[in-house]
From Swiss-Prot:
It comes from Geobacter sulfurreducens (strain ATCC 51573 / DSM 12127 / PCA). GO terms for cellular component: cytosolic large ribosomal subunit. One of its GO terms (molecular function) is structural constituent of ribosome. Belongs to the universal ribosomal protein uL6 family. InterPro entries: Ribosomal_uL6-like, Ribosomal_uL6-like_a/b-dom_sf, Ribosomal_uL6_a/b-dom, Ribosomal_uL6_bac-type, Ribosomal_uL6_CS. This is Large ribosomal subunit protein uL6. The lineage of its organism: Bacteria, Pseudomonadati, Thermodesulfobacteriota, Desulfuromonadia, Geobacterales.
Length: 179
């Protein structure tokens, strides 16, 4: 039995859970999320908790058991608290600006980068060098942060580029040169 999968998920007050035709819909104060539940896994919903059960002990069902529980828990946390990922921009002249649902980035290229944010994602810019990606879908927040980071990843010599706030960049020594 999956150690993660067998733990029940508590439903906080103000969260509404619906499950029909293998589609789970969770609605809370921050928004609404839906997800298709995998075959071989079923959900038992009570007014205070959700339990993930598997149909048999086959490899596919065992693999999906813990994963499904974690995905459902992330949905519950997302509609109640939300998720965020912080990014930092390092480099002379590197800056970011959020205008509605478009993020404008100047990263040392010959052209600015205008990145259209996915629906449900908000980016807050602080002092033009610190970004916070926020949303209710953990997967989408992570993908958006990774996409923004990919425009100019941190380089190991001077540390210029976009990095996660909690990321440590391994720095390399430059050329020593001939003497």
């Amino acid at each position: 039995m999956s150690r993660i999968g067998k733990r029940p998920i508590e439903i906080p007050s103000g969260v509404k859970v619906e499950f029909s035709d293998s589609v789970l819909t969770i609605e809370g104060p921050k928004g609404k999320l839906s997800r298709q539940v995998m075959d071989g896994v079923s959900l038992e919903i009570t007014p205070s908790s959700i339990e993930v059960k598997r149909a048999d002990d086959g490899l596919k069902a065992r693999s999906a058991h813990g994963l499904t529980r974690t995905l459902v828990n992330n949905m519950v946390v997302g509609v109640t608290k939300g998720f965020e990922r912080a990014l930092e921009i390092n480099g002379v002249g590197y800056r970011a600006e959020a205008k509605g649902d478009v993020l404008n980035l100047s990263l040392g290229y010959s052209h600015p980068i205008n990145y259209a944010l996915p629906a449900g994602i908000i980016v807050e810019v602080d002092k033009m060098t610190k970004l916070v990606v926020k949303g209710i879908d953990k997967e989408l927040v992570g993908q958006t942060a990774a996409k923004i980071r990919s425009f100019r990843g941190p380089e190991p010599y001077k540390g210029k580029g976009i990095k996660y706030a909690d990321e440590k960049i391994l720095r390399k020594a430059g050329k020593t040169g001939k003497k």
